[in-house]
Amino acid sequence: MAFTLYALIQTAILFTNAIAVLHEERFLSKIGWGAEQGVGGFGDDPGIKAQLLNLIRSVRTVMRVPLIAVNSVCIVLLLLFG
């Protein structure tokens, strides 16, 4: 298998899918990354953990519908071109 642009795009899609399917109550809260975790006071810089939680929530919110379309296109391309 060659290292192609399509392989890089497919890798990015797989990572985005992995982030999008993380469930807060079933997975993230068990490792201490649930929604009830505090993010600090006003004026404090949020830590790495708070920023990662914000990234995960943002990806789950914003990328839900586009991921369906991108996954469908990838499936069709794989069916057509192998």
From Swiss-Prot:
* Membrane topology, from the record: Multi-pass membrane protein
Broad class of the protein's primary localization: endoplasmic reticulum
Origin superkingdom: Eukaryota
The encoding gene is ier3ip1
Q: Where in the cell is it found?
A: Endoplasmic reticulum membrane
According to the record, the segments passing through the membrane are 2-22, 62-82
Keyword Membrane included in the entry's annotation: yes
Q: According to its UniProt record, which protein family does this protein belong to?
A: Belongs to the YOS1 family.
Gene Ontology biological process: brain development; endoplasmic reticulum to Golgi vesicle-mediated transport; organ growth; positive regulation of extracellular matrix constituent secretion; positive regulation of protein secretion; protein transport
> Source species, please?
Danio rerio (Zebrafish)
- GO CC field: COPII-coated ER to Golgi transport vesicle; endoplasmic reticulum membrane; Golgi membrane
A family per Pfam: Yos1
Summarizing the function annotation, the protein's role is: Regulator of endoplasmic reticulum secretion that acts as a key determinant of brain size. Required for secretion of extracellular matrix proteins. Required for correct brain development by depositing sufficient extracellular matrix proteins for tissue integrity and the proliferation of neural progenitors. Acts as a regulator of the unfolded protein response (UPR).
Q: What is this protein called?
A: Immediate early response 3-interacting protein 1
For this UniProt record, the keywords arranged alphabetically read as follows: Endoplasmic reticulum, Membrane, Protein transport, Transmembrane, Transmembrane helix, Transport
At the highest ranks, the source species' classification is:
Eukaryota, Metazoa, Chordata, Craniata, Vertebrata
**What PANTHER family would the database entry show?**
IMMEDIATE EARLY RESPONSE 3-INTERACTING PROTEIN 1 (PTHR15858:SF0)
